[in-house]
Amino acid sequence: MEDSASASLSSAAATGTSTSTPAAPTARKQLDKEQVRKAVDALLTHCKSRKNNYGLLLNENESLFLMVVLWKIPSKELRVRLTLPHSIRSDSEDICLFTKDEPNSTPEKTEQFYRKLLNKHGIKTVSQIISLQTLKKEYKSYEAKLRLLSSFDFFLTDARIRRLLPSLIGRHFYQRKKVPVSVNLLSKNLSREINDCIGGTVLNISKSGSCSAIRIGHVGMQIEHIIENIVAVTKGLSEKLPEKWESVKLLFVKTEKSAALPIFSSFVSNWDEATKRSLLNKKKKEARRKRRERNFEKQKERKKKRQQARKTASVLSKDDVAPESGDTTVKKPESKKEQTPEHGKKKRGRGKAQVKATNESEDEIPQLVPIGKKTPANEKVEIQKHATGKKSPAKSPNPSTPRGKKRKALPASETPKAAESETPGKSPEKKPKIKEEAVKEKSPSLGKKDARQTPKKPEAKFFTTPSKSVRKASHTPKKWPKKPKVPQST
């Protein structure tokens, strides 16, 4: 029996393909009802043969689907809700309703309230009512959500809590295409609205592929009701799709476990005629894009040429300036700003000031002092040291002298007396001794000086930074008079 049923299904599919594809590529904008009738009849006979073979194991409410293949994959996901003249759900299907929590009431009271509301409008298809509070508490775990998903065939929800459901029910409802359909429970004609939601269908067009399926009925329905539902779906597609009916490529009818039988096919010529304007617009856009790219490349080449010309001009100007100037210094090429009269004046004034500063710094070259000689400034400092017995404050180094170099220190063995005993001919810059005596007479504190105090050695001056402290010179050890040696008597 099963072999004969499969043979009949294949023969029906062959007849369907032969009738659906005409010899000439004529535009078929309307659906052929005879072809739809043949395909549906073949599917029903196949399902009856399977029922006789497997007996009670067969599901009597096996669903029928209409497969839609589009010419182009859409850029965005599309969810189209369509109304059908005949209900596609049987009486044995379980339907669940999610409701809002009523104020100042428990979950049991809210369920009773909405059950009375449905009975008042004569609605008996809803099998269970679940409030939002019970959904949060009892169906929080992963296993509970899967159990809820498998226990019901269709889900309805109150329009007031529709935005709260995605975080509560999870992603599995959306993956298995069991998204709850929103209903306005406050409407006056509630029975009609709920029946339209239950009896209608939804087309989910994904952006991952060009093929999608729509539920159009079940095996227990009459053939005429199924055909009317298919015609209603095709009308809805021609209105809701982005490019209307021209975007439909193929239509098939199938069950969950059977082969797909074709009922409509379009041709490439029809698609080209329908999308002639769109193709022209695309060509124009591509031509504009290519023009922009060419212009951009031309601008890049012009910029490169300008930069190369500037570099060559600067090199040539350097080569011209070098032989003209007899000095070793090489003049730098003037920039564009220096070529203007205003900028040139400013640059000349600054250049003069810089030249003067460099000349002054060059004139102030520090003079080197020999080791054995002394300057008059050093003599004055030594005289004050002998008079007061205190060190003179350390002078900061001259800013004109370089800080990196150190001045040589005086020898440690040299005492002030030895320095004074030098001949005046060797040191022409020395002052006469008369001035030294006059300075001694003016300072009254010279007589109060302690005779036991030895004169301090002259400090070695280092050109260091002013922040560093100068080291103190070590005092010379006291010299005790030696006892004269008495010759031994023989």
UniProtKB/Swiss-Prot annotation:
Q: Where are the transmembrane segments?
A: none
Q: Name one GO biological process term.
A: regulation of apoptotic process
Cited Gene3D superfamilies: 3.30.190.20, 3.40.50.790
Keyword Transmembrane included in the entry's annotation: no
Which residues are modified to Phosphoserine? 361, 392, 396, 427, 443, 469
Name the organs or tissues of expression.
Answer: Expressed at high intensities in the heart, skeletal muscle, and placenta.
Q: Name one GO cellular component term.
A: nucleolus
Where does this protein have compositionally biased stretches of type Low complexity? 1-27
What does the record list as coiled-coil region(s)?
A: 280-313
UniProt lists compositionally biased (Basic residues) regions at 280-293, 344-353, 469-490
Major subcellular location class: nucleus
Glycyl lysine isopeptide (Lys-Gly) (interchain with G-Cter in SUMO2), cross-linked positions: 120, 254, 380, 435, 461
- Indicate, by first and last residue, each region the UniProt record lists as having compositional bias (Basic and acidic residues): 329-343, 376-385, 427-460
Per its UniProt entry, which superkingdom is the organism in?
Eukaryota
> Where in this protein does the record say Phosphothreonine is found?
340, 358, 375, 415, 423, 465
Localization terms from the record = Nucleus, Nucleolus
Kindly give the SUPFAM superfamilies that the UniProt entry links to this protein.
Ribosomal protein L1 (SSF56808)
Q: Where is this region: Disordered?
A: 1-33, 280-490
Q: Which GO terms describe its molecular function?
A: cadherin binding; mRNA 3'-UTR binding; mRNA 5'-UTR binding; RNA binding
The task this protein performs is described as: Regulates cellular senescence through inhibition of PTEN translation. Acts as a pro-apoptotic regulator in response to DNA damage.
Subunit structure comment from the entry: Interacts with ING1 (isoform 2). Interacts with KPNA7 and KPNA2.
Report the family membership.
Belongs to the universal ribosomal protein uL1 family. Highly divergent.
Q: What is this protein called?
A: Ribosomal L1 domain-containing protein 1
Organism equals Homo sapiens
